């Protein structure tokens, strides 16, 4: 099973990756849509819709904000025994010079790609050739 078998889906929402201090706690506010949080020894990272940053309690304590990401989802459920899936994703995106980061939910995998390359990412992950590599096109 590869990425093209799962029909990758592009979410229209622009995503931000936000870094907070290690001791930071999320504010008690309404969060809707895609949201992920990772706490490590030295930082807390939140991945969420850029619109979340319109709430001052989310933006004020951020150390660093990296905007303009889009999320490509591989709808699951993906079996836990699946081997090489993200390696296939990485190979396809690398072949098109598209940087990415990945994250997984319980049944679904996601990759974040730069918004400017999101449509191209879906094209290559769907098993199609990038436009400049299709027969009859000029590079």
Regions found by a protein language model. Give the residues of each.
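A short glycine-rich beta-strand->turn/loop micro-motif centered on a GG-aromatic cluster
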Residues: 97-108
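A generic structural motif
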Residues: 43-48, 108-114
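Regulatory modules associated with amino-acid/nitrogen control
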Residues: 1-92, 96, 120-139
């Amino acid at each position: 099973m590869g990425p093209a078998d799962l029909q990758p889906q592009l979410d229209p929402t622009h995503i931000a990756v936000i870094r907070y201090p290690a001791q930071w706690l999320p504010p008690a506010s309404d969060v809707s849509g895609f949201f992920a949080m990772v706490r490590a020894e030295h930082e807390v990272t939140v991945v969420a819709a850029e619109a979340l940053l319109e709430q001052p309690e989310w933006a004020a304590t951020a150390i660093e904000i990296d905007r303009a990401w889009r999320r490509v989802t591989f709808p699951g459920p993906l079996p836990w025994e699946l081997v090489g899936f993200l390696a296939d994703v990485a190979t396809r995106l690398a072949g098109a010079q598209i940087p990415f980061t990945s994250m997984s939910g319980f049944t679904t995998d996601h990759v974040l790609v730069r918004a400017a390359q999101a449509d191209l990412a879906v094209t290559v992950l769907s098993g199609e050739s990038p436009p400049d590599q299709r027969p009859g096109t000029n590079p």
